[in-house]
């Protein structure tokens, strides 16, 4: 559990003493008896509304954090702050271009800060307190964020906003394409990556010249507050970002009343579609990820592939938008004993080292009920797991089950729409569906992937060139790994991560993703002459 991790990684509070003044809380001392207090930020000022609400510790239920709970009559400052931002943004290629350099400098300083072991350790432990995962998984968030900041240090921010020129039809004419900001924007992100997702997205919004209203799931939002405080310490103007804790309904009201020009939402498909209607389509979405993996006919590296499958399905207790939700095994893999190896690996996961732990958005009862519903499908069987974790103190508002897999025959998955809907329901926890197929059923596998609604990540585990060609040519997932080392999880800073097949689809992490989500194209055609003498001014 997290307490053991803290004990292992902290030596007499040394890391705490080395932190800068921006880190105004002690991760090790947050408890029901000593709750931490989060603050809202608007127009550069930290403040508290009249009410706060408490958040239960995922491990023991203690109310260990107080979160601001602003009401509808308390958010006028947020609305005015966003309304004060022009459509042309805080900066753009023609207005205050020195701010591109400013953010290159901020990134450089922030990367240096996050490179400090005590700072990375602080964020890793803070993440563990709110979004339970193992220390290596939590530390990876800090490391990825640090690498992202390194990537955009120096001139890289203005390089990301690079314009282009095109010659015209006559002397004095030239067209120039610019990446133009939206101005006032919204940014809403979920609980499962409380640092990496909001940090990378808010920086992208700022790079392009927008002013974002930042809202992270209130159950984990203290993490991003600490990141914003660190950015202030590293030179970011204090009024460049507004941060609001609290409930999503009030945030939605702010976005509507302020008439923000665009909003990035990462989270559930249901909320995404509701928000798209409320904001009249002015959204980018990175929503539900019912992600699949296909193991091709060529069996090799069995131990490694089994390990990756286990990591994809159960790391962070399955609470990744890229987690492996369905595994298609070629019969050759079944014959090689893959399922038994998955069962053995799953059995090793435990709460002592946080390789399995609390589930934030699904209760134990809900996950086990879904497991039972899957088992009602003809031919379905429990491959492993399927029980509540033993001897835990996870509060009932959260969930705690063993790593679980239910085998469902491929023909049954395709039998009718109701069964298909049940099988492809995303459980944001340690539960996956597995099935198998023969050479003659490859098209059936493709039919399943075609009928799915979510197209975020996928993995095709094979080095068979013809098999890869067929699978890649007939699928659409925006982030697809292919080859014997393919995985579904992994959203590093060095490649695009996002869905495909939806014009609202958002990406994260790369210059291309930032330009797509946080800027639009503007063309300016300069036509200064000279006007040729004797030009016939004929009306047409």
Predicted region positions:
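N-terminal Rossmann-like NAD(P)+-binding subdomain of aldehyde/semialdehyde dehydrogenases
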Residues: 2-4, 8-174, 217
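ALDH superfamily catalytic-core signature
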Residues: 230-235, 258, 270-418, 440, ...
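Generic secondary-structure signature for well-ordered alpha-helical cores
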Residues: 84-91, 112, 116, 132, ...
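Conserved C-terminal structural/oligomerization subdomain of aldehyde/semialdehyde dehydrogenase
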Residues: 4, 19, 60-66, 96-100, ...
């Amino acid at each position: 559990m997290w307490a053991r991790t803290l004990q292992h990684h902290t030596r007499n509070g040394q890391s705490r003493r080395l932190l800068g003044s921006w880190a105004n809380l002690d991760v090790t001392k947050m408890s029901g008896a000593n709750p931490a207090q989060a603050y809202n930020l608007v127009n550069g000022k930290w403040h508290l509304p009249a009410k706060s609400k408490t958040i239960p510790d995922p491990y023991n239920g203690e109310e260990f954090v107080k979160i601001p709970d602003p009401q509808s009559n308390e958010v006028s400052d947020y609305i005015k702050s966003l309304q004060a931002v022009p459509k042309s943004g805080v900066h753009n290629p023609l207005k205050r271009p020195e701010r591109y350099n400013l953010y290159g400098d901020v990134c450089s300083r922030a990367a240096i800060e996050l490179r400090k072991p005590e700072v990375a350790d602080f964020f890793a432990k803070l993440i563990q307190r709110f979004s339970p995962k193992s220390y290596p998984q939590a530390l990876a968030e800090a490391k990825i964020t640090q690498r992202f900041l390194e990537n955009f240090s120096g001139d890289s921010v203005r390089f990301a906003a690079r314009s282009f020129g095109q010659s015209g039809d006559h002397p004095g004419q030239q067209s120039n394409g610019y990446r133009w900001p939206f101005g006032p924007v919204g940014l809403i992100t979920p609980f499962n990556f409380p640092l990496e997702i909001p940090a990378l997205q808010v920086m992208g919004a700022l790079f392009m010249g927008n002013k974002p209203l930042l809202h992270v799931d209130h159950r984990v939002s203290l993490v991003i507050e600490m990141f914003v405080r660190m950015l202030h310490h590293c030179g970011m103007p204090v009024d460049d970002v507004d941060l609001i804790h609290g409930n999503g309904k009030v945030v939605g009201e702010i976005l509507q009343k302020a008439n923000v020009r665009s909003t990035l939402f990462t989270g559930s498909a249901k909320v995404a579609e509701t928000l798209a209607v409320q904001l009249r389509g002015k959204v980018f979405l990175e929503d539900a990820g019912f992600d699949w993996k296909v193991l091709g006919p060529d069996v090799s590296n069995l131990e490694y592939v089994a390990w990756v499958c286990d990591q994809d399905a159960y790391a962070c207790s399955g609470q990744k938008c890229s987690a492996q939700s369905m595994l298609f095994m070629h019969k050759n893999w079944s014959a090689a004993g893959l399922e038994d190896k998955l069962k053995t690996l799953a059995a090793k996961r435990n709460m002592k080292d946080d390789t399995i732990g609390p589930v934030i958005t699904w209760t134990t009862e809900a996950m086990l009920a879904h497991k039972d519903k899957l088992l009602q499908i003809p031919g379905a069987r429990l491959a492993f797991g399927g029980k509540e974790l033993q001897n835990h103190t996870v509060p009932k508002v959260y969930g705690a089950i063993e790593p679980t897999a239910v085998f469902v025959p491929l023909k049954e998955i395709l039998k009718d729409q109701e069964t298909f809907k049940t099988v492809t329901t995303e459980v944001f926890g340690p539960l996956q569906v597995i099935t198998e197929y023969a050479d003659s059923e490859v098209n059936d596998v493709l039919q399943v992937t075609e009928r799915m609604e979510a197209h975020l990540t996928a993995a095709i585990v094979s080095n068979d060139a013809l098999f890869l060609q067929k699978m890649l040519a007939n699928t659409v997932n925006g982030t697809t790994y292919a080859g014997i080392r393919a995985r579904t999880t992994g959203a590093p800073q060095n490649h695009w991560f996002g869905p495909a097949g939806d014009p609202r689809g958002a990406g994260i992490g790369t210059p291309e993703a930032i330009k797509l989500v946080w800027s639009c194209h503007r063309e300016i055609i300069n036509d200064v002459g000279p006007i040729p003498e004797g030009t016939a001014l004929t009306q047409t």
